[in-house]
Amino acid sequence: DDRIYMALSAGWQTAEASPIRPTVQDEHHHVGFYLANPLYRVVPALYESLAEALQSVYGVAVRLPKLLGFATWVGGDMDGNPNVGADTIAASLTSQRMQVIEHYQADVAALARLLSQTESRVAVAPELQRRLADYRERMPQAAASIRPRHADMPYRCLLTLIGARLALTQDQQTDGYASSQDLLDDLQLIADSLLQHHGVHAGAYSVERLLCRVRSFGFHLARLDVRQDSRVHDDALAALLGDADWASRDGAERAERLRPYASGEARFPDSDDDSATSLQAVFTTLRDSRQSHGVDATGLYIISMARSAADVLAVLALARYGGLIKGDSVPLNIAPLFETVD
């Protein structure tokens, strides 16, 4: 095949690696390609294969719950990389959100072209009609863009307005989706209506595939894990506590001193120390991302070179310093890596 010959020839003529060290942006682009392209495409097929296997073995059709999600630390791995910090965390989260919403917009547009059912030929669920009327009222400009000859195509009309709402979500405007669950609710409404009104072979399969993708990728594409060395935390704490010998103190002593800060009973003073301010910015960014990108956008906070419980308390205390608080607790999944360089 000429295409195989061409690909192999071009590959042999290309260096295995660039002599230029990749930037954080290069790494993010590389990982983002696989998340938003091959993995995005194959996730529904994986669920379908698993459902078919379960039915083949047990003879029962099952609706699978969410089984799969993805995570990355590109843009969030600060350990030993001075180019990674609050700015790259924010940029990665925003880029991933834009990527996945753009894919949803394309899929919704394709569904709108496919689902051309007219009210004179087949009924739709009353709840779908109510949702359509609600969206027409909330997004009059988008509703006015629907062609008059499509006015009696409820699925197409609703999907057009879903696409408009996704565009508002992309721009983080008020009428956009607050969470991917709201998008799932709209798509599930369409899927249920199709199944109830002779649509099993008239588009339900394609809607189910998009539902599967939204469950897996949300509005974040992949959770962003964050990692930092415990010694960087110690540097910041030494400045905040005014204790130059902080890092060399016994783990039990450090834990005892950190408990009131980790629980919120005590507060660190303001500091202009570089280590303290950079970590404060990281935790503030993680706090803000929960509001702008959803609670699923960020994953683990990984502590490399952890030695004791004091290192976990250090992260809790620093997170409070950065304002990452929900109620009385710190909404952070901390994963200490107990390791040494020996």
Question: Which residues does each PLM region occupy?
Answer:
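Short helix/loop capping segments that flank catalytic or ligand/cofactor-binding pockets
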Residues: 48, 79-86, 92-94, 222-225, ...
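A nucleotide- and high-energy phosphate-metabolite-utilizing enzyme signature
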Residues: 23, 50, 71-74, 78-82, ...
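Short acidic, Pro/Gly- and aromatic-enriched capping/linker segments at domain boundaries
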Residues: 53-79, 198-211
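Extended, charge-enriched "interface" segments that sit outside catalytic cores
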Residues: 1-15, 114-292
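Catalytic or ion-translocation cores adjacent to nucleophile or general acid/base/metal-coordination motifs
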Residues: 84-115, 322-342
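Conserved alpha/beta-domain cores
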Residues: 16, 24, 61, 76, ...
